Amino acid sequence: TGSNQHVGNFPGVTVDRKTGSIKGHPDTEITDLPGIYSMSPYSSEEIVSRNFVLDEKPSAIINIVDATNIERNLYLTMQLLEMDIPMVVAMNMMDEVLGNQGSIDVNKMESLLGVPVIPISAAKNEGVDELVDHALHIAKYQEHPLRQDFCDKSDHDGAVHRCIHAVIHLIEDHAEEAKLPVRFAATKAIEGDPLILEQLKLDQNELDMLEHIVQQMETEREVDRSAAIADMRFDFIER
């Protein structure tokens, strides 16, 4: 944005809200959300970022990933993919990766994630123009992420796979009414996310069914619900 940005606060919190327009594209507004590692409701930054994406429904997301710490950063990427919003991944600090004789297979990442992945160095302003072009393109043509099933459906993830799809079937009408992405809502409901459960407005019978489905998965996987979902994501990242 250069110097063309405004700083305010998100309603009800002291988290900065930075907005501006992209150079050469004055009609395009860009909002810089707080740096976070997940969409869990455990900090004001996470809640603000999640609410913005869910409520404002941006035309596209630029997900900036630290290429030197890719595993930790891709956890958030997977949650953003579940929101089914056009997205481009900016693989930042690629100059440091290459400087340390490292490498990242960008084409493989694009294939696995189902979205464009652009290597950049923000510090050196390398790849930024290409990133902006991709972001504007997917926003204009509403190119949503290719649908990915993060479960590998092996014996290890089979229980999680069945659980997620059973919960999707249970909540999909409620998710549509609440204007929530159903895959995201399903995984958060499994984790017991109180804010998402409140928005879904499930009746007691549906809550009981949800609990039964999740408990069955916990029994099969022999881990609790949050760990099962986290394991699914980390297993996918390790591919």
Task: Please report, for each region that a protein language model flagged, where it lies by residue.
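Extended helical scaffolds that flank P-loop GTPase cores
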Residues: G114, Y141-R239
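Conserved nucleotide-binding/hydrolysis micro-motifs of P-loop NTPases
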Residues: S3, G12, G35-I36, A67-E71, ...
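Helical mechanochemical/support elements of P-loop NTPase systems and associated helical scaffolds
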Residues: P11, V15-K18, E29, P41, ...
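Canonical P-loop GTPase G-domain recognition
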Residues: D95-D152
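Conserved C-terminal guanine-recognition region of P-loop GTPase G domains, centered on the G4
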Residues: G20-H25, V48-I118
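Catalytic cores of large soluble enzymes that bind and process phosphate-bearing ligands
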Residues: V7, Y37, P41, T68, ...
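Conserved G1/Walker A P-loop phosphate-binding module
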Residues: T1-S44, L54-E56, A60, E82
